[in-house]
From Swiss-Prot:
Heterotrimer of UreA (gamma), UreB (beta) and UreC (alpha) subunits. Three heterotrimers associate to form the active enzyme. SUPFAM superfamilies: Urease, beta-subunit. One of its GO terms (molecular function) is urease activity. One of its GO terms (biological process) is urea catabolic process. It is found in: Cytoplasm. This is Urease subunit beta. It comes from Dechloromonas aromatica (strain RCB). InterPro entries: Urease_beta-like (IPR002019), Urease_betasu_sf (IPR036461), Urease_subunit (IPR050069). Pathway: Nitrogen metabolism; urea degradation; CO(2) and NH(3) from urea (urease route): step 1/1. It comes from the Bacteria.
Length: 101
């Protein structure tokens, strides 16, 4: 084994298995691209994104860790969100929650 080497088992991994998910239609109403990372609390994303924010409270994008989704100006796309795990406490981001969900 080489230091830092990862040995993966054969087969496929299912991301976020068994966690609640929702699907939302999101539109970028601004004039600049908006990029949202994999672990960003979707409820607190840029105000230029138009979608059902209350439905997104406690959810993040259902994509691989370290990746992101980019919304071009005027673009509308459908995204899948997955429930945040762990203690379900949210701090930082845009400061809209600052505590337990």
């Amino acid at each position: 084994m080489i230091p830092g080497e990862l040995l993966a088992e054969p087969g496929e991994l299912e991301l976020n298995a068994g966690r609640p998910t929702i699907t939302l239609v999101v539109a970028n109403t601004g004039d600049r691209p908006i990029q949202v990372g994999s672990h960003y609390h979707f409820y607190e994303t840029n105000a230029g994104l138009s979608f059902d924010r209350e439905a997104a409270r406690g959810f993040r994008l259902d994509i691989a860790a370290g990746t992101a989704v980019r919304f071009e100006p005027g673009q509308t796309r459908t995204v899948q969100l997955v429930a945040l795990a762990g203690d379900r406490k949210v701090y930082g981001f845009r400061g809209l929650v600052q505590g337990a969900l």
